[in-house]
């Protein structure tokens, strides 16, 4: 029998009676040196500082018939190496059982006196994670840290993305006599050093609640700069079929209303808002900050001149090109021939030019007209006031 045991912070006293009994009955005990050091003298089993599944399986094969215990820090079901051993044990027909332990998230929750059921759980320990995307999507995010990613490095990434005011809590050496809890903003914690055994909780209390496509027009900061209206934005996002990890371009971004919605629809991707007018660029910065669209990157300059160095897009919204539509399409399709494209137009001439440009490049052009009317009070009555009709032209491969 092989027993896989979560040892929490490494304290023998924190183990259940069943887990302690399994360790004491075992002939072989595997685990990291830190965990083996926590075993009491009455555990007389042969102790081996091994934790890689292949090494453990090889040793078990060399010692047939012996019961074994394998110790893991934290809980066996929470980003643990236990699953990496349990699968081959079952495949080999070796009997195995699991005793869970107390995870670091439970220890931090207890130390803070707060429940953790609403926290998003993310591991940055030995695996890639995007803290900016996670904190854009979730109000409270718990990070396991380790290796190259520390609480300070994660907070630095948040600060660099404009989320330096997010609240942070770092738990060090949880469940031990050296336990410490530190508080601060992401910007403050980014410049500090922490114990190797640390976890991070980030709380973004200013997370925008707007998520469905088509944010109200009045929610954006605007001036005289033209803005794509709510209903058109919602339709454009539907046409672009945005995926969470997409790389997106918004050419002729104006106030940034489309860019912001694209950014929040693709929190694990990047949005490049291309705009040449200084007043509009300032509005994009303000709306980016207001909506915490931290994955929105402003590209100041005229398209297509500034497009050459951008990464290949998965989808592109073209709201204005100042006569350079064909050159913009060439840049887009040169980087990704299968990019999803949506062009907005008011003038019939622009509509015709868009259809011709897409068709000439082997794309099928589909045109949707959006005519929006909104009510306006007139004394005791309400009248419908029409906005200018908008054309959305999408281009897809035949």
Region roles according to the model:
Residues 1-102, 106, 268-271, 275-277, ...:
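Class I S-adenosyl-L-methionine
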Residues 2-6, 50-51, 65-68, 140-224, ...:
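A contiguous loop/helix-start segment that scaffolds small-molecule binding in enzyme catalytic cores
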Residues 245-254:
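Conserved class I S-adenosyl-L-methionine
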Residues 276-313:
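S-adenosyl-L-methionine
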Residues 11, 74-139, 300, 304-305, ...:
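Class I SAM-dependent methyltransferase SAM-binding "motif I" and its flanking Rossmann-like core
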Residues 255-267:
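Conserved SAM-binding loop of SAM-dependent methyltransferases across substrates and taxa
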Residues 338-346, 350:
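Conserved beta-strand signature within the Rossmann-like core of class I S-adenosyl-L-methionine
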Residues 264-271, 337:
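Conserved S-adenosyl-L-methionine
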């Amino acid at each position: 029998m092989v027993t896989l045991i979560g040892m929490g912070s490494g304290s023998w006293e924190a183990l259940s009676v069943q887990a302690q009994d399994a360790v004491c009955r075992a002939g072989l005990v595997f685990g990291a040196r830190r965990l083996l050091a926590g075993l009491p003298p009455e555990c007389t089993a042969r102790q081996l500082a091994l934790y890689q599944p292949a090494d453990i399986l090889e040793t078990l094969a060399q010692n047939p018939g012996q019961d074994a215990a394998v110790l893991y820090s934290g809980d066996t079901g929470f980003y643990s190496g236990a699953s990496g051993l349990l699968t081959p044990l079952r495949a080999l027909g070796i009997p195995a059982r699991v005793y869970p332990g107390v995870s670091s998230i439970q220890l931090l929750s207890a130390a803070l006196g707060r429940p953790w059921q609403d926290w998003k759980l993310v591991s940055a320990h030995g695996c890639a994670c995007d803290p900016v995307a996670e904190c854009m999507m979730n109000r409270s995010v718990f990070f396991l840290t380790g290796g190259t990613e520390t609480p300070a490095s994660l907070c630095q990434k948040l600060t660099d993305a404009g989320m330096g005011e997010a609240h942070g809590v770092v738990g060090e050496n949880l469940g031990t006599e050296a336990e410490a809890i530190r508080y601060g903003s992401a910007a403050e914690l980014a410049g500090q050093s922490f114990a190797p055994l640390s976890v991070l909780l980030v709380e973004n209390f200013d997370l925008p609640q707007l998520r469905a496509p088509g944010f109200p027009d009045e929610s954006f900061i605007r001036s005289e700069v033209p803005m794509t209206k709510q209903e058109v934005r919602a339709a454009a996002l539907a046409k672009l079929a945005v995926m969470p990890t997409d790389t997106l371009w918004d050419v002729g971004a104006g106030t940034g209303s489309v860019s912001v919605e694209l950014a929040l629809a693709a929190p694990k991707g990047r949005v490049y808002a291309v705009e040449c007018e200084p007043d509009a660029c300032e509005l994009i910065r303000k709306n980016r900050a207001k909506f915490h669209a931290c994955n929105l990157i402003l590209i100041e300059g005229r398209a297509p001149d500034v497009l050459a160095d951008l990464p290949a897009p998965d989808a592109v919204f073209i709201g204005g090109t100042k006569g350079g539509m064909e050159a913009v399409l060439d840049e887009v399709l040169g980087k990704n021939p299968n990019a999803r494209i949506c062009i907005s137009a008011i003038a019939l001439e622009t509509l015709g030019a868009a259809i011709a440009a897409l068709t000439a490049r082997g794309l099928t052009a589909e045109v949707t007209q959006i005519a929006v009317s909104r009510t306006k009070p007139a004394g005791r009555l309400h009248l419908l006031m029409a906005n200018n009709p908008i054309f959305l032209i999408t281009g897809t491969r035949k």
